[in-house]
């Protein structure tokens, strides 16, 4: 069964086709083999965690490692950061457009509460500590995160910052009456991620 292409694998293939055409076949094979190995090593993870592993974390690691065969480590990191950033900018545009619907912005903190509980909960490898979840405020400290843990486990903790940055790009300035705040992230070396989305 052919694996579904993620945005990261698609962008990786585009990079190697454009920049390294002579080695594209070899690089694509190396990427596919590494991703298959990573998926096999994490096959026993919960269904909830698999969602994050398959969609972003493992393709990110495979792309980052494979690109280092043909470019310096820092350039490989910036290249993968570019992939993640591009998706975050698209997501920001779509969300901001949706929030043009009058009054819809007021629902955003509540949506964050629900999605944290369903997609970013303990079953997926996160450890959220809810500080405030009502009256137009979503404030959560994330004490553990599979993006951070998996990147660190595979020796590339610096890669996690791509995913941290994507949150800031996606959620900053969505609407004049919504405030996104975060001063710390596990991926940037802090002991927690202090998330907050609130109605002004």
What function would you assign to each model-found segment?
Residues 3, 126-130, 180:
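Generic structural motif
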Residues 49, 98-125, 173-198:
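Unusually extended, aromatic-enriched hydrophobic runs near protein termini
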Residues 24, 75, 178-179:
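Secondary-structure boundary/capping signal
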Residues 136-141, 146-150, 154-200:
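C-terminal non-catalytic interaction appendages of large macromolecular assemblies
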Residues 55, 66-155, 159:
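Amphipathic interaction/junction segments at domain boundaries or subunit interfaces
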Residues 1-67:
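N-terminal, charged low-complexity regulatory/assembly segments
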């Amino acid at each position: 069964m052919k694996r579904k292409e993620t945005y990261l694998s698609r962008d990786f293939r585009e990079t190697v086709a454009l920049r390294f055409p002579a080695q594209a076949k070899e690089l694509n094979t190396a990427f596919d083999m590494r991703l298959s190995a990573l998926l096999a090593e994490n096959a026993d993870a919960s269904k909830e965690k698999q969602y994050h592993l398959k969609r972003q974390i493992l393709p990110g690691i495979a792309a980052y490692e494979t690109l280092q065969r043909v470019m310096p480590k820092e350039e490989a990191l910036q290249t993968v950061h570019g992939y993640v950033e591009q998706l975050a900018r698209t997501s920001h545009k779509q969300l901001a457009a949706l929030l043009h619907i009058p009054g819809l912005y007021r629902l955003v903190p509540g949506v964050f509460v629900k999605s944290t509980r369903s997609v970013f909960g303990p079953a997926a490898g996160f450890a959220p500590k809810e500080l405030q979840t009502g009256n137009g405020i979503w404030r959560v400290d994330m004490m553990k995160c599979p993006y951070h843990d998996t990147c660190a486990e595979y020796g590339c903790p610096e890669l996690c910052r791509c995913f941290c940055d994507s949150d800031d790009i996606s959620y900053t300035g969505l609407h004049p009456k919504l405030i996104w705040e975060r001063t710390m992230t596990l991926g940037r070396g802090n002991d927690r991620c202090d998330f907050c989305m609130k109605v002004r």
